[in-house]
Amino acid sequence: MALSINSEGNDVAKYVAARGVTGCVLKYRLAHTGEDATQEFGAMLADGQKFHEMLGKVVPLAVADGLAAVTYVRQHASEWGVSPDRVGIIGFSAGGAVTAGVAFHYLPEGWPAFVAPIYAGGEMSKDASVPVDAPPMFVAAATDDQLGLAPESAALYEKWTSAHKSAELHLYAKGGHGFGMRKQNLPTDHWIDRFADWLELQGWLQK
């Protein structure tokens, strides 16, 4: 597997940094692949059983990395001039699954101020309960997602709101999987602006 480190990582960090938010990009553990990760991933998707076996092995490790990252940033926030109570997490696709995992399984020292799973799978959150002190959630996905993750994204939103927790959902008609910060001349081009609007609404863009 591979990380989409630019359109779903560095570019997002640069966008929020321009609005006064410190962005950290996490490289979490992935399934082992050869040189052509895209080709191998496509073949794995064609074999549903093999794909889910892979997820069962790697997702817990990736979520553990996400949990550790939030805790680490909170513990070192004061050194970097960041408030530990304003540390949140956003992730896309597999990173969205990491974000969802953090949303459900954090410990007090790793409490995220907000969570934003974008076109996320929820392998570790399907049977999990919403935490009592769950943070606000922002969710976005495209209905024509090739991996079929729009329903899972909607399910995350529904689970949050059913527990009477704050959540916002954006489901786009088109955009496919992995739209991230890529420009496609579609409404998904502006999801990041809706995310910024939501951050401002929550008070996270105010110093």
Where are these regions (language model features)?
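Serine-hydrolase catalytic machinery in alpha/beta-hydrolase-like enzymes
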Residues: 1-80
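Flexible, surface-exposed loop/gating regions in the mature catalytic domains
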Residues: 46-47, 53-56, 101-102, 126-131, ...
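Alpha/beta-hydrolase active-site loop signature
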Residues: 30-32, 122, 176
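Primarily recognizes the serine-hydrolase "nucleophile elbow" in alpha/beta-hydrolase
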Residues: 60-133
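Generic structural signal for well-ordered alpha-helices
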Residues: 67-70, 157, 196
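C-terminal catalytic histidine-bearing segment of alpha/beta-hydrolase fold enzymes
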Residues: 39, 140, 161-207
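The feature captures the conserved acid-bearing segment of alpha/beta-hydrolase catalytic domains
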Residues: 113-171
